[in-house]
Amino acid sequence: MSSERVLSYAPAFKSFLDTSFFQELSRLKLDVLKLDSTCQPLTVNLDLHNIPKSADQVPLFLTNRSFEKHNNKRTNEVPLQGSIFNFNVLDEFKNLDKQLFLHQRALECWEDGIKDINKCVSFVIISFADLKKYRFYYWLGVPCFQRPSSTVLHVRPEPSLKGLFSKCQKWFDVNYSKWVCILDADDEIVNYDKCIIRKTKVLAIRDTSTMENVPSALTKNFLSVLQYDVPDLIDFKLLIIRQNEGSFALNATFASIDPQSSSSNPDMKVSGWERNVQGKLAPRVVDLSSLLDPLKIADQSVDLNLKLMKWRILPDLNLDIIKNTKVLLLGAGTLGCYVSRALIAWGVRKITFVDNGTVSYSNPVRQALYNFEDCGKPKAELAAASLKRIFPLMDATGVKLSIPMIGHKLVNEEAQHKDFDRLRALIKEHDIIFLLVDSRESRWLPSLLSNIENKTVINAALGFDSYLVMRHGNRDEQSSKQLGCYFCHDVVAPTDSLTDRTLDQMCTVTRPGVAMMASSLAVELMTSLLQTKYSGSETTVLGDIPHQIRGFLHNFSILKLETPAYEHCPACSPKVIEAFTDLGWEFVKKALEHPLYLEEISGLSVIKQEVERLGNDVFEWEDDESDEIA
């Protein structure tokens, strides 16, 4: 090097942001920060011992652990505190006055540095995260400041200080959080002290540059603070310490005596924005959509819109309880298909279909999970496979099973007993049961079993231009109030409604939009219900939790109704529950073959007899009145 020159500087760091950094930023933005764009702390551990030979600066590696307050450092690593400002809108990021922003950060470093010279080093990242496209815009800045008077105009080599290099390196290894040290009157390396350096005039700085005889721009920060502490200092000795080879010593001269030694808000030049890969002073853009696992992207994207609800509209919405709910769909037809699509849109991950039918040629146009090639194949398995094609991380299962129906005589008792056992096991394994089958009698056994297992039931049923959506009231021993089930309005036990029906009665003849309306309301009722552990609560963060919703398309009206449980209900009355508890399958078998048996157990037969007696009394009274008139 020449005998005398103006001191020049190299960039402080070269940034490397790992994909895990952006993934953690995405998680924090969605789940924690939301609309908060204020400063968030970062921590980086610099490895100054293992710098690649091809690198001109120390790599600044940022990973998901950079967001941790206590980022565990390894031996000889140097901790560095920084921050990130993640903007909500791309235009905010673009229109930010970058120079003013960096100047403000430099003033913060200056204010920290005049209290402790080791605190005048930091870094900052400004960013915008496009979470839909997985594109991240960011720019790293390392605030490097220099007051006019602290410009080093003359530097000359000082070979006599080379013997201090190893001592300084060892001192920095022990004092890993320090960036500067000084030489005292006894030629010992000690912590920075402005009273001592005023006399010895020897300053050693830890360096992050690898360029020969060119220190990093961070040196300007330390020299500015040094001159503030010792305003009359002109000539001094400067040691640039690198943990590997390349340390050097200089005789240095400040441009002038500091005229602003008492100023805490000095006039200073600030630089530090990192250049991009093209060598331009501009932000960088990272597109992770092609780098991340598509399944990981799908998993996060499914929850994106749901989590955005919590940013502004519903901050108290509990999405985890919905996501972790295990749902059983009894019926994989029109209702089952639409309900399942609404469930996965709400983030439900576990769905089991139960159906014993196959896809007919009339189904694909109305049942959203099937297409023409599926005709003739089992519905339940196909529905589960279709959900997995839509979202591969779904835990979807299809079970081909015939639900034993009341009023239908046993054909194969062994097989139907197995179906009963399997159905009861499925109901036990799931949290919410949707009854989406196409006959009243097929709803009886699931209603009974769900009541026995105290499971929440959501019922959806269709008419030509009407629909019913209702939830069954769970048994609550602490409350005398219990809502009615699907059968609580019946005055007779369910019977065979499928035999001897014409074609228009066997097929589901409804206005096509009715199924979609009922399905969506059924799922929305479930999500509202899940927001509170008390099924009888009137409102949640999502609003009301009605018992029944009845819709009529002929005048486009909706009614919300509530009815209590009926003490003689053939599905949920205490006597029916008691009989099933005592007899199990034997009770079910008798009820299937002899509906009148169920009426006797529930007490409906007594009600029928009383009604008939009252009717006879009325007729006798009318006959007496006629005789008198005559």
UniProtKB/Swiss-Prot annotation:
Subcellular location: Cytoplasm; Preautophagosomal structure
Motif position, GXGXXG motif: 331-336
Cited InterPro entries: Atg7, Atg7_N, Atg7_N_1, Atg7_N_2, ThiF/MoeB/HesA, ThiF_NAD_FAD-bd, Ubiquitin-activating_enz
Active site: C507
Start and end residues of each stretch annotated as Homodimerization: 591-630
Listed GO biological process terms: autophagosome assembly; autophagy; autophagy of mitochondrion; cellular response to nitrogen starvation; cytoplasm to vacuole targeting by the Cvt pathway; macroautophagy; mitophagy; nucleophagy
Keyword Transport in record: yes
Impact reported for R511A: Impaired homodimerization and ATP-binding
Key words of the record: Autophagy, Cytoplasm, Protein transport, Transport, Ubl conjugation pathway
Pfam families in alphabetical order: ATG7_N (PF16420), ThiF (PF00899)
Cellular component, GO, one term: cytosol
Major place of residence: cytoplasm
Annotated effect of mutating Y486F: Loss of interaction with ATG8
Molecular function GO terms recorded: Atg12 activating enzyme activity; Atg8 activating enzyme activity; identical protein binding
Function: E1-like activating enzyme involved in the 2 ubiquitin-like systems required for cytoplasm to vacuole transport (Cvt) and autophagy. Activates ATG12 for its conjugation with ATG5 and ATG8 for its conjugation with phosphatidylethanolamine. Both systems are needed for the ATG8 association to Cvt vesicles and autophagosomes membranes. Autophagy is essential for maintenance of amino acid levels and protein synthesis under nitrogen starvation.
Assembly mode: Homodimer; homodimerization is required for ATP-binding. Interacts with ATG8 through a thioester bond between Cys-507 and the C-terminal 'Gly-116' of ATG8 and with ATG12 through a thioester bond between Cys-507 and the C-terminal 'Gly-186' of ATG12. Also interacts with ATG3.
UniProt note: domains: The C-terminal 40 residues are required for homodimerization, as well as the interactions with ATG3, ATG8 and ATG12; and the C-terminal 17 residues are required for the ATG8 lipidation. The GxGxxG motif is important for the function, possibly through binding with ATP.
Family assignment from sequence similarity: Belongs to the ATG7 family.
Protein name: Ubiquitin-like modifier-activating enzyme ATG7
Taxonomic source organism: Saccharomyces cerevisiae (strain ATCC 204508 / S288c)
Gene name linked to the record: ATG7
